[in-house]
């Protein structure tokens, strides 16, 4: 969910997200790879990320898993007790995976890619932006070529 929330901030195109209000929540959650657990150094807007010690990375991963397990167990218990899904979903953590459809024009897609595939973008959303760029290159090769030739800046 945390990547989707960053994505939705672009306010371009239209989004249709899977709703835990009407369907059972998934039991899939984001656990970063050990090398993706990092510390933030510096001030907001002007910071960098540094790797953490392997022990801290593993501890972080274990704690995330424990929180996810507890939250999903609570969610299921509430639903089984008759609590409406729209209320039970409130216990779901930001690391829960979500699904959505995105309808977007080429110009807005290029803008998204130029911002979110940059080295300064959050690593997790950068991976999705890179996938969007591959899609752009496959479906609109001439447009993608012009995008790259123009310094990866949307017109």
Q: What do these predicted ranges mean?
A:
Residues 1-155:
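Family-specific signature for flavin-dependent thymidylate synthase
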